[in-house]
């Protein structure tokens, strides 16, 4: 089964990625992806796009040839306080805000620091999805993080790229996160973390973990465009109202 939604992609605007929006649209059409988010790295990363890149995402059309586009960011969690590198009214102009740890911005420290930073980001109300929380370079108190995510309505990502090209050794942590999410009622989403369009919608490894713990697939945000759009609307993203009529025939 091809899940029709991908929340985590990078374009050539992040210079260690290799595809354009046009490339992603073409692959989405081929694979049956109905909605994807463009989420380039936040400005604190060395090769990230300029701040204006995110401001000007408003020029992107809502839908091209039947494929919807969400305007987003993968922000960086910068410190123990859980602050991210995108702020103010600009956040409200985006459809979706991802955030996670990246070594060039927040070097690995210790379990207590990572846990506090992640929970503070969750509590901030600014972040919709925590990216690659299973990264073994950043050990966390999984139960504490998942509990906070469930309480504050923030989704946790099972990152497919973590099992293929980055963050080697993530399997055990991701399995524990998925299991805790099932037990504590937290929302999960699979992210391809594509840095080239060919991997858009690639969830095989992430899905194997979801299935191994028997996480309810009717709670996965990837299950339909409306499932994700409803989630984002509930989190205060008024801008997604523009997209909802385009998926009016969709079952959440």
UniProtKB/Swiss-Prot annotation:
GO terms for cellular component: cytosol. Zn(2+) 3 binds at residues 74, 102, 132. HAMAP family: YcdX_phosphat (MF_01561). Zn(2+) 2 binds at residues 16, 41, 195. Binds 3 Zn(2+) ions per subunit. This is Probable phosphatase Shewmr7_2686. It comes from the Bacteria. Zn(2+) 1 binds at residues 8, 10, 74, 193. The keyword Zinc applies. GO terms for molecular function: phosphatase activity; zinc ion binding. Belongs to the PHP family. Gene3D superfamilies: Metal-dependent hydrolases. Disulfide bonds: none annotated. GO terms for biological process: bacterial-type flagellum-dependent swarming motility. The keyword Metal-binding applies. InterPro entries: Phosphatase_YcdX_put, PHP_dom, PHP_phosphatase, Pol/His_phosphatase_N, Pol/histidinol_Pase-like. Its EC number is 3.1.3.-. Keywords: Hydrolase, Metal-binding, Zinc. Its cofactor is Zn(2+).
């Amino acid at each position: 089964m091809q899940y029709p939604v991908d929340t985590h992609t990078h374009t050539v605007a992040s210079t260690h990625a290799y595809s354009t929006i046009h490339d992603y649209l073409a692959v989405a059409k081929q694979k049956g992806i109905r909605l994807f988010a463009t989420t380039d790295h936040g400005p604190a990363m060395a090769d990230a796009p300029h701040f204006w890149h995110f401001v000007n995402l408003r020029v992107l059309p809502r839908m091209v040839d039947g494929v919807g586009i969400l305007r987003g960011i993968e922000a960086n969690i910068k410190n123990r306080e859980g602050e991210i590198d995108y702020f103010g009214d600009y956040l409200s102009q985006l459809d979706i805000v991802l955030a996670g740890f990246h070594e060039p911005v927040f070097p690995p420290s210790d379990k207590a620091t990572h846990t506090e930073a992640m929970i503070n980001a969750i509590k901030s109300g600014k972040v919709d999805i925590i990216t690659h929380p299973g990264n073994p370079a950043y050990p966390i108190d999984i139960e504490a993080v998942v509990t906070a995510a469930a309480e504050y309505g923030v989704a946790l990502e099972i990152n497919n790229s973590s099992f293929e090209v980055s963050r080697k050794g993530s399997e055990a942590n991701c399995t524990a996160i998925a299991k805790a999410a099932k037990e504590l009622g937290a929302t999960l989403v699979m992210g391809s973390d594509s840095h080239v369009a060919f991997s858009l919608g690639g969830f095989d490894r992430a899905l194997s973990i979801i299935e191994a713990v028997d996480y309810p697939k009717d709670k996965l945000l990837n299950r339909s465009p409306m499932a994700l759009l409803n989630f984002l609307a509930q989190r205060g993203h008024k801008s997604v109202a523009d997209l909802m009529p385009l998926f009016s025939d969709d079952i959440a």
